[in-house]
From Swiss-Prot:
It is found in: Cytoplasm. SUPFAM superfamilies: alpha/beta knot. This is tRNA (guanine-N(1)-)-methyltransferase. Its main location: cytoplasm. Pfam families: tRNA_m1G_MT (PF01746). S-adenosyl-L-methionine binds at G113, I133, G134, D135, F136, V137, L138. GO terms for biological process: tRNA N1-guanine methylation. Keywords: Cytoplasm, Methyltransferase, S-adenosyl-L-methionine, Transferase, tRNA processing. One of its GO terms (molecular function) is tRNA (guanine(37)-N1)-methyltransferase activity. Coiled coil: none annotated. It catalyses: guanosine(37) in tRNA + S-adenosyl-L-methionine = N(1)-methylguanosine(37) in tRNA + S-adenosyl-L-homocysteine + H(+).
């Protein structure tokens, strides 16, 4: 996979892309990152990338020319048709399902905005996706773009140590993930549930399923609205409601 980041602050990416899973993914040739300062594509001698909004108002707006030129040139160099992603508060709410969708692509290109926002022509005629990571506003799109890239890259084949690692993550099954424990079995009187040390894999599997459902019911009941509950799971929820 190829992932490009168009940004005015390329230095923000160095630590994240060069660490942990993202660095390992590059070492395994699973992904190739490219960070591009689109200021270099500005067509004026001062390399201006923003201007005052028509109609007045606070803040500055990113001009279309540098962004269009950068995207068109980088796309031509790479060949193909990348998913061109705007990260912005007005976009589609990001989910694990969207991460899985993007992980099937060959080329992603993130446009990281700053200032008051993008010229609307970028949104209407250049981007293929608009993504929001939540109902709040950040200074720029760099942090959300890195977060999305991380969630996508870890899904690529061979990146994680075990292929099933991401299959049990929160949201991958439609539920929050079950609790985890490690040694010691008794720490300051706080004990690991007996079932996890029993060696009975069928009971362990059932415990994890039940705890995953319980955690979702208590913390994110909205996720259960479209979740296909079994009859047994419905009984569990009924018991929890009556406590």
């Amino acid at each position: 996979m190829k992932i490009d980041f168009l940004t005015l602050f390329p230095e923000m990416f160095e630590g994240v892309l060069g660490s942990s899973i993202l660095q390992k993914a590059q070492d395994k040739d699973a992904v190739r990152f490219r960070v591009v300062n689109f200021r270099a594509y500005s067509d004026n001698k001062h390399q201006t990338v923003d201007d005052y909004p028509y109609g007045g108002g606070a803040g500055m707006v990113l001009k279309p020319q540098p962004v269009f030129d950068a995207v068109e040139k980088l796309t031509a160099e790479a060949g193909g048709s990348p998913r061109i992603i705007l990260v912005c508060p007005q976009g589609e709410r990001y989910t694990q399902q969207k991460a899985e969708e993007l992980a099937r692509e060959e080329h992603l290109m993130f446009i990281c905005g700053h200032y008051e926002g993008y010229d609307e022509r970028i949104r209407e005629h250049l981007s293929t996706d608009e993504i929001s990571i939540g109902d709040f506003v950040l200074t720029g799109g760099e942090l959300p773009a890195m977060m999305i890239a991380d969630s996508v890259v870890r899904l690529l084949p061979g990146v994680l140590g075990k292929e099933e690692s991401h299959l049990e993550d929160s949201f991958s099954t439609g539920l929050l993930e079950h609790p985890h424990y490690t040694r010691p079995a008794d720490y300051k009187g706080l004990k690991v549930p007996d079932v996890l040390t029993s060696g009975n894999h069928a009971k362990i599997k059932e415990w994890r399923r039940k705890e995953s459902l319980r955690r979702t019911f208590l913390r994110r009941p909205d996720l259960l609205e479209n979740y296909p509950l079994s009859e047994e799971e419905r009984k569990w929820i009924s018991e929890w409601k009556n406590r």
